[in-house]
Amino acid sequence: MPQVLLAEKALICGAEGLDTINHAALIVRDGKIEAIGREGELELPGDAVIQDLGDRWIMPGMVDLHSHVAGSGHNDMIFQCNPGLRASANVTPHNESLKLGMLAGVTTVLYIPGSGTNMGGQGVLLKTGPGSYEESLVRFPGSLKVAQGDNPKRWGYGMQRTMMNHHIRVTLRKGKAYAKRWEAYERGESERPERHLHLDIFRDLEAKRTQISTHTQYYQVVLASLNILTGEFGFDAYIDHGSFDSWPLSYLAEELGVAAILGPREVLWPRANTYPKDGRVEGSAWGFQKEGHPRIGFNTDAPVVPQEELPLQSAMGVRYGFDNTHFAAARGVTIVPAEVAGIDHLVGSLAAGKDADILVVTGDPSDPRSGVEMVWIEGEVVADVRGERGRDREGVRQW
């Protein structure tokens, strides 16, 4: 049976087009958004169950592209580069941390290995609501996790950035050659290559079916990430865990089509070993936006910042200069990460055909005074705190 939600305002969060619809009506059928429009102008199904949400707003569920809380959050530091390891083997669906994130409106996460090595392995995109792994799965592989900077220095005997960049290049070179051999075989131009499970991820990367999510920060480190991953090897990659003073590279990131997903540190402070700031405290998102970068999002690095504080990350961006005139902060936790991860056909905005992952909020989610009152995932109510109700698909209380 279709459902209709009537709300004071709908935050569309699309990549382009309308920011909002006042006095909105949204139709949900079979777990998908069927239509959205202005109440009185949108034809409603005669058999629909109508929920009038009064002065509340509706918006799409939020997406976090840097999370470690869908399982243990650790990584096996066997080698400096471990492209074959899979975080999907370590998932505990709808665990307590994911529940808290869900209650705050985070409906999709990229669960990835940690940053103890330059290449921690393969991430997995998951819904945060109740259900099995198979029911939660959005896409595997969700990404190849690459980490640059200080954390992987601690691996083994210790190494500096030059050697780490060498390791990354060698692995990418092997992986790209492996993917090319398989492409030649599939075109009927060569014999079947020997299968190497630890390099299979590069077939997905070469075919643009997934991306490299890159734990990268500081100017020099982000410069290496941009030049190596996308500039030299042509893989789709994005800045993930973007922090500190990387925004002066916005021009290069934009030129290479690399998005900036920022956090868990949203603020830059004056330091001796960086460019002069004249005593200013600067926001990372402000810097990228000031330079004209079109794709800026936010992440938590949960549990470093709790999963439920993803909207607070965007609020900090706004507090430190990010222009939110057209709800760019809401887009930064919805459609921007969805597009970057290649799942915007499923989630990220209120549009016909997408999963009915919908939030009922009391106002702009980048305003810390706003709260989430209801959460739908794929057309099912998974949280309703208006009357402190919360039940999973079997009717069991969630918290």
What name fits each language-model region?
Residues 8, 26, 31, 55, ...:
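Divalent metal-coordination and catalytic microenvironments
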Residues 9, 74, 81-85, 211, ...:
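His/Asp/Glu-enriched, well-ordered alpha-helical/loop segment
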Residues 102-236:
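Polyanionic/metal-chelating signatures
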Residues 69-72, 114-120, 219-223, 244-248, ...:
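Active-site environment of divalent metal-dependent phosphoester hydrolases
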Residues 8, 12-14, 19-22, 339, ...:
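C-terminal cap of metal-dependent C-N hydrolases
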Residues 1-45:
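N-terminal metal-binding scaffold of metallo-dependent hydrolase/deaminase domains
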